[in-house]
Design a protein with these regions (language model features):
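Helix-turn-helix/homeodomain-like alpha-helical modules used for DNA recognition
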Residues: 82-128
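Residues within the helices of the helix-turn-helix
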Residues: 19, 30, 60, 90-91, ...
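Intrinsically disordered, low-complexity regulatory/linker segments
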Residues: 14, 34, 53-54, 66, ...
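The alpha-helix within a helix-turn-helix
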Residues: 22, 33, 63, 93, ...
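Short alpha-helical DNA-recognition segment
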Residues: 26-45, 97-113
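A short, Lys/Arg-rich alpha-helix, primarily the initiator
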Residues: 2-24, 75-95
Length: 137
């Protein structure tokens, strides 16, 4: 990655933003992992786009190390999770005037899945977030 004079806003993914800030700080992946208390392989997977979801507590520690806010490194999906998935799912369902069963049918999941999302017991995957929310951003 050649960061040159690039702005972090240029990067769309969490992985690219993490890599950008790490390079700006002149740190190795091992150094970041050691500072935030995770395995190097875990941190490496963060920069290799091997995941959609990033634990916010870890991202907050990484962001602090980089001297930025966690919201500077997360993408829209992880921001959705940070801002409270449960309330957002329920608000959208109520806005569309759909029952949980109708909303589930519309989205292609079970009513139990909708309940889990609305109660914060289950995390909505990025695939379903894109289907349900991405077009509204």
């Amino acid at each position: 990655m050649n960061i040159g004079n690039d702005s972090p806003a240029k990067f769309d993914t969490v992985a690219d933003r993490l890599r950008y800030y790490r390079h700006r700080k002149g740190l190795l992946q091992r150094e970041v992992a050691d500072c935030v208390g995770i395995e190097r392989t875990t941190y490496s997977s963060y920069e290799e786009e091997k995941r959609d979801y990033y634990p916010i507590d870890i991202l907050e520690r990484i962001a602090e190390l980089y001297g930025v806010k966690a919201t500077d490194v997360i993408d829209d999906y992880n921001l959705f999770l940070l801002n409270g998935q449960a309330s957002q799912v329920k608000a959208l369902r109520k806005k569309t005037k759909l029952t949980q069963a109708d909303f589930a049918n519309h989205v292609g999941v079970t009513k139990q899945q909708i309940k889990g999302w609305e109660q914060g017991r289950a995390r909505m995957t990025k695939k379903f977030w894109q289907k349900v929310f991405a077009n509204q951003l």
